[in-house]
Amino acid sequence: MKKLAFLILLIVFSNLSLVNAIDDNISNYSKEINELTVKLKELESKNPNDERIEEYKEKLKQLIEKQHELKSQNLKYNETLAYIQSEEYWKMQEEIWEYNNKVMKWFIAISILILGIILATLWILRKDKFLLFLAIFGLIVPFLQFKIPNWLFNILALPLFVYIKFIVPECAEGSFYYSPLITIPISMYGWILIGLAVKFIIKKY
C-alpha cells in the first residue's frame, strides 16, 4: 500500500515537473520569437533587400512551429483549445453579446429619457432666472470634480455630497450609484430644491 501511494506521488510529481518544463520551454520560445521579430522588423525597415531577412523568416517559422508543438503537449493548453472550439463556448459568447447589446440599448434609452427630462425642466424654468441659473450650475458642478480642490467641490456639489454621505452604501465603490445618469440629475434637481427653499424662506420672512 505504501509502495502504491509512493508510486502515485512519484507519477504526479513527474507530470508536474514535465508540465513546468514544457511551460518554461514555451516561455523561452516566446522570448526568442519576440526578439527575432524585432530584429526582422528593424532589418526590413533599414534594408528590405538584405539576404538575412529570408533566413530570419525561416528561423521564425521554425520557432513558432516548435512552440506550437510544445503547447500541444501541455494538457491545460489542449483543454483550453478544446473548450474554445466547443459549441458551449460559442453559445456562451453569443449570450454575452446579446446581453451586452440589450444593456447598451437600455442605456441609450434611459440616457435619452433623462436628457429629455432635463431639457424639459430647463424649458419650464426659463422664466425664473434664479432657478434656471441654479439648474445649469447643478449640471456643470459634477464635471468640476477633478479640476478644483476637494473641499470646494464638496461645497459646490452639496446635493451630491448629501447623496453620497447618506444614501450611497459604503461598499458601493465604482457601482451604478456613481453613474453620471444618476449624479448629474441629482446635482441639478438638488440645486433646484435648494433654490425653491431659499425662495420660500425669503417669501415667508
UniProtKB/Swiss-Prot annotation:
Protein name: Uncharacterized protein MJ0585
GO terms under cellular component: plasma membrane
Transmembrane portions of the chain: 4-24, 105-125, 130-150, 151-171, 182-202
Organism of this sequence: Methanocaldococcus jannaschii (strain ATCC 43067 / DSM 2661 / JAL-1 / JCM 10045 / NBRC 100440)
Primary residence: membrane
Subcellular location: Cell membrane
Keyword Cell membrane: yes
Membrane topology: Multi-pass membrane protein
UniProt KW keywords: Cell membrane, Membrane, Transmembrane, Transmembrane helix
